[in-house]
Amino acid sequence: MHVNPLIRVGVLVVVCLSAVTFSAADKAKLDDFARCLGQKKAVMYGAFYCDHCKEQKDLFGDSAQYLPYVECVEKGTRKVTEQCKTLAIRRTPTWIFEESGDRIDGKVLSLQELSQKSGCRLP
């Protein structure tokens, strides 16, 4: 069966536009989720050289910029900041959930785990 090339192009355009719209909507939801963590006083403490911290941030993609994040190491020195010394942050990432008093040291948390601990709705 022969299909008109214009129909093929039209279908392709609709599919591409749907994918872009879906991605933008998902990104906005992930932005909201990251912001909610901050509102619920769930804070990630990390270090710029920490692979697991990068892995944690990567779960959020571009939305990582909205994560409540505290850098525990002064860049270029590897000296631990006073705030992180006071909180006894020894392994990163460390998540502290102020509202519940929970603390998880040295573990990458899934979005599901972050949702359960914080009360923020998953996107």
List the model feature ranges, each with a label.
Residues 84-96:
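Structural micro-motif
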Residues 22, 26, 90, 103-106, ...:
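Catalytic phosphate/metal-binding cores of nucleic-acid and nucleotide-processing enzymes, i.e., regions
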Residues 48-52, 73-75, 90-91, 101-104, ...:
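Solvent-exposed loop/turn segments at secondary-structure junctions
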Residues 36, 74-83:
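Structural microenvironment flanking redox-active thiols in thiol-disulfide oxidoreductases
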Residues 26-68:
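Local sequence-structure signature of Cys/Sec-based thiol-disulfide redox active-site neighborhoods
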Residues 14-22:
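Hydrophobic h-region of N-terminal signal peptides that target proteins for export
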Residues 96-123:
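Non-catalytic, surface beta->alpha helical segment in thiol-disulfide oxidoreductase systems
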Residues 2-10:
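Bacterial N-terminal signal peptides that target proteins for export
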